[in-house]
Amino acid sequence: MPIEFIATSKLPTAFGEFNISVFQDPVTGEEHVALSKGLENPPTGPVLVRVHSECLTGDAFASLKCDCGPQLQATQKLINEAGQGVILYLRQEGRGIGLTNKIRAYALQDQGHDTVDANLLLNLPADARRYDMCSIMLDHLKVKEVKLITNNPLKIQALKDQGINVVDRVPLTVGRNPFNEHYLKTKRERMDHLYQKDDF
């Protein structure tokens, strides 16, 4: 996937000051974001990295159906405390199926289907995300070694497949609530996420 660096700026946030960089696919116009801290000079060791797919409902509207918003905020806090790290914010709403289909899937979940079956009932993949842009974004930031903040083993393998040296995994268990317990259980049981049983 050809993407190009197009803009950067400082970004003060409630969790500390970061740099925000925008990368664009010149063919589709799709824009992805790197929110970084402490990378003004090339890092000399592994860097905290989270690959976070866009979730309008969770990130912007504080939806309780998922754990995306709390994960994003917890990562910003973690990186700010560490003084170095990057969030790759990928524009892949609804695990890559888009906002409209995501809301259609939500309607099916309201009828009792889990997050996997809801997608499949719409004739869509359970997870349609891609990660081929990550290596270009990390290369631009001079990040060579990664401590990946994730519970998803597929992300670890996807980054390794891009030639990224993932040296460690940092678990992230936040945002559990009565509305998303079934969703989190489904991610563990059907999508192989690395939650512990006592996380639920």
UniProtKB/Swiss-Prot annotation:
Molecular function (Gene Ontology), one example: zinc ion binding
Active-site residue list: D127 (proton acceptor), R129 (nucleophile)
Keywords, comma-separated and alphabetical: GTP-binding, Hydrolase, Metal-binding, Nucleotide-binding, Riboflavin biosynthesis, Zinc
Xref: InterPro entries: GTP_cyclohydro_II, RibA, RibA-like_sf
Keyword DNA repair: no
Domain of life, source organism: Bacteria
Cofactor list: Zn(2+)
Substrates-to-products reaction catalysed: GTP + 4 H2O = 2,5-diamino-6-hydroxy-4-(5-phosphoribosylamino)-pyrimidine + formate + 2 phosphate + 3 H(+)
EC class: hydrolase
Function (record text): Catalyzes the conversion of GTP to 2,5-diamino-6-ribosylamino-4(3H)-pyrimidinone 5'-phosphate (DARP), formate and pyrophosphate.
Full protein name: GTP cyclohydrolase-2
Organism encoding this protein: Acinetobacter baumannii (strain AB0057)
UniProt gene name: ribA
